[in-house]
Amino acid sequence: PFLYLKEQGFDVDFVSVDSNGHIDLNQLISLIRDDTILVSIVYVNNEIGAIQNIESLVHSVKSINKNIVFHTDAVQAYGKLKIFPNKEGIDLLSVSGHKIHGPKGSGFLYIREKSKIKPQILGGGQQEGIRSGTENVPAIVGLKEAVLEYFTDHEKKIMKLYECKQRLIEQLLQIEGVVVHAISSDVQTAPHIVSVGFEGISR
């Protein structure tokens, strides 16, 4: 989407991450201009599982320009972490249903009350004019059921994920030539992602 915006004439900058997958905050701040309208950050790095401190990033961005819209891609975070969009100051948050065992193609967008959204699909004005077209009722119901199921005994499920992840990492580290990324004590990672490298094998 951002490359498409660039083709349409928008100025788009990409922020670097360090070896642990964390945003370079100094670079992010340096890229903010008077005419910056949007900052979009992935909540959880989908390759190594690093968790961004979204609340801190939002604060840093908004302290420079409170009118910047802050979006986070929470596809890998929703259901795996406790997310509080209002408390964290998030304006837009996107979620994909299949990551919590909902129907493929389903998802939702959290929109902060004062955020203005321009529809990309025009027509009948469904979904409060944000996305026209006949609603996919089975997918909507399936997503709802997936959310209800996923958040039943939620903390217990997350603890189980962390236990399985730790067990997997311990076993992997016993194999010669295997490297597990982002496992230092100062890196907070999601419970469901393990990044592994094998000596002698490139991408």
Where are these regions (language model features)?
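Pyridoxal 5′-phosphate
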Residues: 1-203
